[in-house]
Amino acid sequence: MSCYTREQIEAAVKAKGYAWFEGAKDFDVNIVGVRNSDTGNKVTNAFDDCITISYKEGGEWKSHCWPATTDPGKKGVQQYHNAAGVARLVEGQYRGSHTLGLHQGKYEALKQQKPVKVYRDPNRDLTYDENKIAEGVFGINIHKAGADSTYVENWSEGCQVFKKAADFESFMAVCRKAAAIHGKSFTYTLIESADIK
């Protein structure tokens, strides 16, 4: 899936009625994941989505778009750790849902701190079922895979995961600057590629 411009992301977010942050201070970030609509509910095991971040610095808009997954991988679907089934984040805007914190106690990432909605799929058939929704704090973090991972596998059991570690570090550098100005809470928005015109 190709990446998008800030204007495309902003228009799609506003069209959904979600907040778009553009305060007077620098680094009022908009973190938006874009799920690839073309793959439907099939487990592709690929980093075929993207994560974007848009913000102003010195009064000028800046934006970045990186390959990622917003879906669990094949191993995540088949070997999940929650008895209710693997989690797949429901599209929406989750205000203040994440904070700077350690992913699995290992390295700094954006860690879920407030409830989000997830689809739960317990049947391991490599098709995401969307008929059962749960809401809560499930550890749906925003983190990295390997240096440059090819397959999602169990890098995600519902987390939003960057394909490349270097891209994730660039993302986190912006988040740290944002936290120094606006505090450690971050809003995460997930949309579909079909939402982008």
Please give the residue ranges for each predicted region.
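Cell wall/extracellular polymer interaction/catalysis modules
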Residues: 1-153, 167-176, 182-186, 191-195
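Residues immediately within or flanking Cys/His clusters that coordinate Zn2+
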Residues: 156
